[in-house]
């Protein structure tokens, strides 16, 4: 499937406490990264206090390496400063250093960094796409996509994924490279991100055919990355969107994994910053409340439907799901030109991000409130949606 994950099965993280600071534990089966951690600071911390804490970490780490002959570790790698106030950092520390950090009163919690990765992707050649027609029609089985000519003009979609082939003809020069937090290749060598971007803003496959697309790469050629790297991409997208106008921005995250408080907090920071964020519910046919960032309530969580208006058998479900969108056998762009057919909640999510961009083009407003707007125009048609799950399927309100 197209959803990016590693945790099977997913579950709420257990928590432990080491000398005061909470350590968010991941369950068995989740691939944690050895001696790598994400540290999140207390709410309301000032920049001055954060800088002081970082200086203390660097001094203490160096002292341990030099004076105590501690095991060589890389120390602090990246700091997070979301415009909405969330602060933290990731790094490579031994247990003793984490114990020292945990004693600090200014630390909210510490989380072990974990791997995220694309699951097997279903591919079927030469199958016509149906998702666009379904978004623009109140009845299934259509072959025409009805939409307003504004088509998301003036909006910007941040695709936090494997990158995007920005030269693909589908984007007509509207796609740009934003940032790369996983490797030194500014290209989509996997294909997942280009497919997602095409569903949002492609001239043929896109819901919002005139929207701008910004590639934010957080996963490598194998579709592999880390929670800390994904959060770096989320931070960058939030800052860039605020500089250019958050009310005109949407973000898409067709990725996830086991419950991560840090991932959820970063997603909440994007929404608090005024950016509409659509996130995949997951492909394990379990309750999405046990995965992140899908379980964050302030974002728009998307499950996958079939051409027959039923829940896709792989799709996660549950109360955290906001809407269903087409996610089974979806045709979109592939790197180097042409198209491919993929399935997953990864494919459903850009239909929702694209619809958000489309509504921005119509002057319906932006920000996290777009999820409520999308739910209001959705139609009640999904069969067997899953326990405690909405049966709403997205619709662009064209009236057809």
Swiss-Prot record:
Residues 21-119 form a propeptide. It comes from Arthroderma benhamiae (Trichophyton mentagrophytes). The active site is at 161 (charge relay system), 192 (charge relay system), 346 (charge relay system). Secreted subtilisin-like serine protease with keratinolytic activity that contributes to pathogenicity. Its EC number is 3.4.21.-. One of its GO terms (molecular function) is serine-type endopeptidase activity. Residues 129-400 form the Peptidase S8 domain. GO terms for cellular component: extracellular region. Residues 1-20 form the signal peptide. Glycans are attached at residues 58, 222, 252, 396. It comes from the Eukaryota. Its main location: secreted. InterPro entries: PCSK9_ProteinaseK-like, Peptidase_S8/S53_dom, Peptidase_S8/S53_dom_sf, Peptidase_S8_His-AS, Peptidase_S8_Ser-AS, Peptidase_S8_subtilisin-like, Peptidase_S8_subtilisin-rel, S8pro/Inhibitor_I9. Keywords: Glycoprotein, Hydrolase, Protease, Secreted, Serine protease, Signal, Virulence, Zymogen. Residues 36-118 form the Inhibitor I9 domain. This is Subtilisin-like protease 7. It is found in: Secreted.
């Amino acid at each position: 499937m197209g959803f990016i994950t590693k945790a099977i099965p997913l579950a709420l993280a257990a928590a432990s406490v080491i000398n005061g600071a909470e350590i968010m534990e991941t369950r068995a089966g989740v691939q944690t990264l050895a001696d790598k951690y994400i540290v999140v600071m207390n709410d309301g911390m000032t920049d001055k206090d954060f800088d002081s804490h970082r200086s203390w970490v660097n001094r203490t780490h160096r002292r341990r390496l030099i004076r105590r002959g501690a095991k060589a570790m890389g120390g602090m790698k990246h700091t997070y400063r979301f415009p909405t106030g969330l602060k933290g950092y990731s790094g490579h520390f031994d247990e003793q250093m984490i114990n020292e950090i945990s004693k600090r009163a200014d630390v909210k919690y510490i989380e072990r960094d974990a791997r995220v990765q694309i699951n097997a992707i279903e591919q079927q050649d030469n199958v016509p796409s149906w998702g666009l027609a379904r978004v623009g029609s109140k009845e299934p089985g259509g072959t025409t996509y009805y939409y307003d000519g504004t088509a998301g003009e003036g909006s910007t979609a941040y695709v936090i994924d494997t990158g995007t082939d920005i030269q693909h003809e589908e984007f007509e020069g509207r796609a740009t490279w934003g940032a790369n937090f996983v490797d030194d290749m500014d290209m989509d060598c996997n294909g997942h991100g280009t497919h997602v971007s095409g569903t949002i803003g492609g001239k043929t496959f896109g819901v919002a055919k005139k929207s701008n697309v910004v590639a934010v790469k957080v996963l490598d050629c194998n579709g592999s990355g880390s929670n800390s790297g994904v959060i770096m991409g989320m931070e960058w997208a939030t800052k860039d969107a605020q500089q250019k106008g958050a009310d005109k921005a949407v973000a898409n995250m067709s990725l996830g994994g086991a419950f991560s408080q840090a991932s959820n907090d970063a997603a909440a920071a994007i929404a608090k910053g005024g950016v509409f964020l659509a996130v995949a519910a997951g492909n394990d046919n379990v309750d999405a409340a046990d995965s992140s960032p899908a379980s964050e309530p302030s974002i728009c969580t998307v499950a996958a439907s079939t051409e027959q208006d039923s829940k896709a058998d792989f799709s996660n479900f549950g109360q955290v799901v906001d809407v269903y969108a087409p996610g089974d056998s979806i045709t979109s762009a592939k790197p180097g030109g042409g198209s491919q057919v993929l399935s997953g909640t990864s494919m459903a999510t850009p239909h929702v991000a694209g619809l958000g961009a489309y509504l921005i083009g119509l002057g319906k407003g932006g920000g996290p409130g777009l999820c409520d707007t999308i739910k209001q125009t959705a139609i009640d048609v999904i069969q067997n949606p899953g326990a405690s799950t909405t049966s709403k399927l997205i619709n662009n309100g064209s009236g057809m």
